């Protein structure tokens, strides 16, 4: 099962990313848990300085923007 973490405070773009990630999981037809991470210390541990950030299975996939659900689906499928 994949673990997807959405990094950032409770902002509009963070919510958009969380929804896009959930849609991507459904679209990809995979098992994944989408987690919201708001703790600044934890976010810095990933080296993310611009939010929202997206981490898939411990690897930073995106920072400072909201990738589309299609992009996230591709990343989840390994494309």
Model-assigned labels for residue ranges:
Residues 47-55:
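Structural micro-motif
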Residues 30-40:
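Thiol-based oxidoreductase modules, predominantly thioredoxin-like and allied folds used
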Residues 1-25:
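Local sequence-structure signature of Cys/Sec-based thiol-disulfide redox active-site neighborhoods
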Residues 59-79:
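Non-catalytic, surface beta->alpha helical segment in thiol-disulfide oxidoreductase systems
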């Amino acid at each position: 099962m994949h673990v997807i973490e959405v990094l950032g405070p409770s902002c509009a773009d963070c919510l958009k990313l969380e929804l896009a990630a959930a849609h991507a999981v459904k679209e990809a037809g995979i098992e994944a848990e989408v987690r919201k991470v708001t703790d600044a210390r934890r976010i810095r541990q990933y080296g993310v300085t611009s939010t929202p950030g997206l981490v898939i299975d411990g690897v930073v996939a995106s920072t400072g923007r909201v990738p589309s659900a299609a992009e996230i689906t591709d990343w989840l499928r390994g494309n």
